[in-house]
Every structure is written in structure tokens, then in C-alpha cells.
């Protein structure tokens, strides 16, 4: 008797990214819940009166069929199709499961910059991006960094000319207005395994100065020697003349050009006899400051008394 051999038809299953399933809560355990629906049907292709046997990579028996959801790491299993006869003639094939690493990304916090550079009213500032990739790929809890041998990084951003750019690094320094840069990390073996992260670059304006010089003229208060040229001034009353946003800004007053001698109580300031000068520094809520009306200008902020 010559018995016809069964046929173990070739079966395949798509490689998967770790964690890329609602059933997979751990994207770093290298195990994926594969949906094996259809494997048995493809394997037999209509054959009957046969029994199938599935063995893992260590030749441990899994079952006569695979579970509908088969949780496994990367491995190649062996499948035997055997006739239900006394001769038990059989044929074999293999099925490869591949679980690819999914990248992880971590928060990259870029400190806010004040408008600066060639112009300090154009909304641009230069940012140091030398450590962006390192921070993006490094787990802050374990200090473990994903290797660029395994993963690629790309950035989508708008350059100084308004062009949308895709590049594997950010310019350094990165001269930009406020924008969200999208970083994408991808497994080099499987481009489906990728993740994105927004990196926020924020440029905030400096104080907008209306006038850099305010003159205060006031009658002698008559205290002390008559007409001694000394009187008390509330310097804070002129803040609105310097800036429209004065209520949201911090004003500091100094008696010297180098801003080393601070006036502790500007609401009760006695001037030097007959003529005095007070120098100012104005700071926004974001910490951006001006001491002159224009960038590095000689038009210093000053009160003349």
C-alpha cells in the first residue's frame, strides 16, 4: 500500500510591533497577541481526515490547533500534518512569528526663550538643540537610551524661510518662531513600528516700550530747608507711560546706570537736590526684560527728576 502524503501548505503571518494591539498592554515585553484565525484553514486547504500538531521553537507541543489569539515572542514554530491512518504519513512546514521592538519617546522640555537675535521684535530666537535626540530616546527613570543603530529619528519643522522640512536632525542653533516640531522615532527593521512626539519651541516677546524717557516735574514740598530741591516721588505712577502692559510687568528702579543700586521703595523716593536720574528695568511675566527701548540701544529707560 502506498499512501498519499498529506500537504502542509505554506502559512505566514504578518510581523507585528510590540504593543500595537488593544490586547497588548506592554510595548516592551517583546510579546504580541497574534490573531491566528485562518492559519488552520490555509494550512489544510480543504484536506480532511488529517490531524495537525503544532510545536514551539523548543519542540514543545502547543496543541492540535493554535489558540485564536496566540501570545508569543519572535519564534519559528513547526507544524505537522498527519493522515488519520495506521501509517500516519505526514508532512511538515513552519510558521514564523516576528515581534519587532516598538520605540519609546520621552518628553523634551525646551525652556522658553525671549525674542532675541538680529532683531528682538521679529518673534525669532535661537535654541540649543544639541541634546534633543538624547533626551527624546532616554528613559529618565532608568537612564537607558535606545540605540540609533536600531531606531531612526526624524523631525518635521518649519525653517526660517517658511519651508516645511523633514530632516534627521534639528539645526543647532535652531532659529525659530514659536512652533511645535514633530519628532518621529522608527524601528529600522519595521517602519510600521514608529511613534511621534511634539516638541514645543516657544518664543515670547520682550516688553513693548512706548517712551524710554519720562520727566517728572514737581514743586518743592517745603520740608527741610526751604526750596532745597528735594521732594518725595511715587515713581510707580509713571509706569503706564513706559508700557501699556505695565500691570502685568515688573518694574525695578535703580539710582545708577549699571543697575546695581536698587531703589527698595519706589513709591516713596526722595530725589537728590534739584536734579536726579532713575534707571529702569522692565520684566514680563515670562522673564523677558528690557533696559532700553530698542535692542542694546542707547535709549535707556530713565526717569529724570
Model-derived regions, located:
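Extracellular low-complexity Ser/Thr/Asn/Gly-rich intrinsically disordered segments
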Residues: 1-305
Amino acid at each position: 500500500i502506498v499512501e498519499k502524503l498529506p500537504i502542509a501548505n505554506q502559512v505566514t503571518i504578518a510581523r507585528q510591533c510590540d504593543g500595537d494591539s488593544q490586547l497588548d498592554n506592554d510595548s516592551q515585553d517583546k510579546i504580541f497577541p497574534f490573531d491566528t484565525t485562518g492559519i488552520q484553514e490555509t494550512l489544510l486547504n480543504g484536506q480532511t481526515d488529517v490531524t495537525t500538531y503544532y510545536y514551539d521553537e523548543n519542540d514543545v507541543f502547543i496543541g492540535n490547533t493554535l489558540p485564536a489569539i496566540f501570545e508569543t515572542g519572535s519564534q519559528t514554530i513547526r507544524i505537522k500534518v498527519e493522515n488519520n491512518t495506521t501509517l500516519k504519513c505526514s508532512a511538515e512546514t513552519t510558521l514564523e512569528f516576528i515581534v519587532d521592538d516598538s520605540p519609546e519617546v520621552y518628553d523634551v522640555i525646551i525652556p522658553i526663550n525671549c525674542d532675541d537675535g538680529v532683531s528682538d521684535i521679529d518673534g525669532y530666537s535661537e535654541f540649543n538643540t544639541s541634546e534633543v535626540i538624547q533626551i527624546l530616546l532616554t528613559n529618565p527613570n532608568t537612564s537607558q537610551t535606545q540605540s540609533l543603530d536600531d531606531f531612526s529619528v526624524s523631525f518635521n519643522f518649519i525653517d526660517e524661510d517658511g519651508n516645511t522640512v523633514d530632516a534627521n536632525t534639528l539645526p543647532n542653533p535652531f532659529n525659530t518662531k514659536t512652533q511645535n516640531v514633530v519628532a518621529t522615532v522608527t524601528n529600522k527593521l519595521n517602519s510600521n513600528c514608529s511613534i511621534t512626539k511634539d516638541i514645543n519651541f516657544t518664543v515670547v516677546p520682550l516688553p513693548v516700550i512706548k517712551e524710554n524717557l519720562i520727566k517728572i516735574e514737581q514743586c518743592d514740598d517745603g520740608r527741610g530747608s526751604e526750596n532745597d530741591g528735594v521732594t518725595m516721588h511715587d515713581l510707580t505712577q509713571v509706569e503706564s507711560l513706559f508700557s501699556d502692559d505695565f500691570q502685568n510687568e515688573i518694574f525695578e528702579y535703580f539710582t545708577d546706570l549699571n543697575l546695581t543700586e536698587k531703589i527698595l521703595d519706589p513709591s516713596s523716593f526722595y530725589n537728590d537736590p534739584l536734579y536726579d536720574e532713575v534707571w529702569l528695568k522692565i520684566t514680563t511675566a515670562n522673564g523677558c526684560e528690557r533696559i532700553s527701548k530698542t535692542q542694546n540701544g542707547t535709549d535707556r529707560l530713565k526717569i529724570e527728576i
